């Protein structure tokens, strides 16, 4: 790329930085005063004219200054050479705050609240997806001789409890047999494989009384737990940040709020995150969702040891501090994975 192109990109970079900071359209005089671009105001005006002609900036009707377009933001993001990481103190604070979570739900609630505070945007965290979860432990507890509590714990820390009404009583020996069979069928398996193994048990133990009845009834309860789509759950934090930035969304704020409430659009974007440590930035129309066209979404996956549990990120206006937001999303995702992996 030639010197003129490099210089024009520096002008674009300065326009993005100033517009994000001030919310005001940027003129050539302001660029000369605030940035050491090493060229005259006339040269900057010429560069801005080229950037506008190429679609990187535009002129609002009510101002003589310029603002970045979606294309301009994309060029800015694509050419971010280094994203400054959070400070050591900030990283320690994040880690400590998440480690204080008492269970999966608490850790994720803390994460979404923290991410919203760090970025001043709406934070979204997807609950761990069933398709990638593994059964860590199954507990079968007798509440009475004919009533069992089934507790399934996944490696991500998700806990699901169900009651199995047996109809007939079983003794302690049969309870021990049942617990061992179910644990062997499910333990260490992905939930899809665990579901198949439990279904196989139902086929092998057909009967109306004793152990066969207990296996059938408890297995059916477990199948209900395993096949429920709890991945279609989304935690939100910082929704009030949208209203504080309402001017950035024009008349689309209501549709954005509706999309967040319905969750489907955001979950689809998060489900596309399949690689922990890789941050994706979607700007405006790149979301491919009409309800949130006026937003940008910065997202990544979180998980442990090569296993992706779900997606997370932030949603906000295209006028966003992209470097800071990328760093915050990456850091919180990293520490969620570390905290969940240590449990």
Curated annotation (Swiss-Prot):
It holds the Pfam family HrcA. One of its GO terms (molecular function) is DNA binding. Keywords: Repressor, Stress response, Transcription, Transcription regulation. GO terms for biological process: negative regulation of DNA-templated transcription. Coiled coil: none annotated. Negative regulator of class I heat shock genes (grpE-dnaK-dnaJ and groELS operons). Prevents heat-shock induction of these operons. Belongs to the HrcA family. This is Heat-inducible transcription repressor HrcA. It comes from Mycobacterium leprae (strain TN). The lineage of its organism: Bacteria, Bacillati, Actinomycetota, Actinomycetes, Mycobacteriales. The gene is hrcA.
């Amino acid at each position: 790329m030639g010197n003129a192109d490099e210089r024009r990109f520096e002008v674009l970079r300065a326009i993005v930085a100033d517009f994000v900071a001030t919310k005001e359209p940027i003129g050539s005089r302001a660029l000369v005063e605030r940035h050491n671009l090493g060229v005259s105001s006339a040269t900057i005006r010429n560069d801005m004219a080229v950037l506008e002609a190429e679609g990187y900036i535009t002129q609002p009707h009510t101002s003589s200054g310029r603002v970045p377009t979606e294309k301009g933001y994309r060029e800015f993001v694509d050419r971010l050479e280094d994203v400054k990481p959070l400070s050591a103190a900030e990283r320690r604070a994040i880690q400590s705050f998440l480690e204080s979570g008492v269970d999966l739900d608490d850790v994720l609630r803390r994460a979404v609240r923290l991410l919203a505070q760090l970025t001043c945007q709406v934070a979204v965290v997807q609950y761990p997806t069933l398709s990638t979860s593994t059964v860590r432990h199954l507990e079968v507890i007798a509440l009475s001789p004919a009533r069992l509590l089934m507790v399934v714990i996944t490696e991500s820390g998700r806990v699901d409890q169900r009651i199995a009404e047996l109809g007939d009583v079983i003794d302690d020996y049969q309870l021990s047999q049942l617990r061992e069979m179910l644990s062997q069928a499910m333990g260490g398996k992905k939930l899809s494989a665990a579901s198949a193994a439990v279904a196989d048990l139902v086929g092998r133990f057909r009967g109306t009384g004793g152990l066969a009845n207990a296996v059938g009834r408890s297995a059916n309860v477990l199948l209900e737990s395993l096949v429920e789509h709890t991945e279609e759950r989304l935690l939100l934090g910082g929704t009030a940040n949208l209203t504080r930035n309402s001017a950035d969304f024009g008349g689309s704020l209501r549709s954005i709020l509706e999309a967040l409430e319905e969750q489907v659009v955001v979950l689809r974007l998060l489900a596309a995150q399949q690689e922990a440590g890789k941050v994706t930035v979607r700007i405006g129309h790149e979301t491919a969702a009409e309800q949130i066209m006026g937003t940008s979404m910065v997202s990544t996956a979180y998980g442990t040891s090569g296993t992706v549990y779900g997606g997370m990120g932030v949603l906000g206006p295209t006028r966003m501090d992209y470097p800071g937001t990328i760093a915050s999303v990456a850091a919180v995702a990293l520490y969620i994975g570390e905290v969940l992996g240590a449990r």
